[in-house]
């Protein structure tokens, strides 16, 4: 067994990206051992949320001071302090989970729209989007499926609860949901695109149509306008 990774010395707000980096070293089903911050630094429930976002199941089993983290197939969150906007997909596709970049399948128009809107300046580079532009990325549900219609409504409800805790902890001012299904399933079945009256924790909520190429009713200029509006707050 390799030596555990000691995550106690990093700042609490840097923990999501540290866990994401650790996640990228493991294949699904593999385990990693980490020495995690004490409960008075990061609450256990929040720590479980952050582990889930990074693609780890947080196990109770400990080896000395280390906790075993088991990797599952998903796309790790790209989140951290100072975000101005959190972009939230429905859930990862197998391609996104395996390639490590969301919205990157051929025909998906998220990145072309994000570039055209001035939201990001590098194509398919979520790390740069976070560090250079304050744009984070996550998903409502972290379970990977081939189609979003394979998800259950309860998964959206549980996923939004995780997001509430995260956006309040990181003080995210606004969240943009790419795809309407998650918000409709968990909060407002009649919700349309645009800014919502209801917030997600303390964050304002913007809904926009799916950027998938299967969504023929939304053109690239329309998607660009939605992202520009979400970024403008």
Set out the residue ranges of the language-model regions.
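An N-terminal amphipathic alpha-helical segment
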Residues: 1-33
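Short, surface-exposed acidic-centric catalytic microdomains
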Residues: 4, 99-154
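C-terminal capping/extension of enzyme domains
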Residues: 43-45, 50-81, 106, 113, ...
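Internal catalytic-core helix/loop-beta-alpha segment
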Residues: 134-189
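Short, well-ordered beta-to-alpha junction loops that form the rim of enzyme active sites
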Residues: 37-39, 90, 177-182
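Short, hydrophobic/glycine-enriched beta-strand segments
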Residues: 79-90
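Short N-terminal binding/cap micro-motifs at the start of the first secondary-structure element
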Residues: 94-98
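Short, conserved loop/helix-junction motifs that constitute active-site signature segments
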Residues: 25, 167-170, 198-201
